[in-house]
Amino acid sequence: MPQPYGETSRGFRFLALGSALAAWALVAVGGVVRVTGSGLGCPHWPLCTAKAIPLDQKASFIEYSHRAVVALLIVLVVAVAVWAWRSYRSRPDVLWPALAAVVLVPLQAVLGAVAVWLKLPGWVVAFHFVVGMLFLGTIVYTAAAAWRRAERPATPGFTRLAWGTVLVGFALISVGATVVALDADAACGEQWPACNGGFSVGGGHADVQVAHRMLAYTVAGLALALLVFALRARGPRLAGSLPILAVLIQMTFGILIVVVGGEGRTHEILQGLHVGGAGTVWAALVALAALSGDPRAERAARPLTVTPAVAG
């Protein structure tokens, strides 16, 4: 039965949190699939091969582990959406992202299948990754909104800054996926912060790599601003510190990928950490934006006070 605007139940909060953790795990396992070249470890879909699941092969095991996490996540996401529909239709900040996650499930599944059928073309893989991040964002937002206390909203300025950072963060993810699609990881050689001896761009893949770096610096600056605002008690303090920490760790992985270079084991590990780090940064930004609250929802939640007229 739908409940009035207010805090969600403990069971729902933990179910939503479990879904968010599973969604992050999916991104991390997807990174392992990419850096180990296991994307075609299962050449058929949804089964691994035409008749069986050959888990004795490393690539097949890694790829099918990715699909197993997907299956678990679908169950969790549908459960969250059904619960939200039945009990929290008065909480649009919980209901709509939960339903959006369900809508994104078939799109993401189709993209994954197409990627396998077409032998992993770069642009399909990149689009698959971007949609996967949108999927992660909707689930994380649902979980964070479910845990948010209605009586402790952040200031409107903090909320706007948080959402602005989310938008720039999504641009960073999209350009990063483009770097992968174009195989432009080494477009700047092993140079950082410079690119091919300078900072100017001269066309080609270097442009995309430089754009990716500039967006990363911008997100870092915005995350630092969020931390300053949060420490001044204008936003969630603990959550406000997470984005800058995640961004700094992620930038370290990115710099090491460039400096180390090569195609060795260390390079592969760093690439995997960079993909997982991207999911962590994105989740931290979305969670902070959700926890900062929606002033419109807060106003709607307050009871209307009517002052009786004084007879003259």
Question: Where does each model-flagged region fall?
Answer:
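Polytopic transmembrane helical bundles with strong interfacial aromatic enrichment
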Residues: 1-312
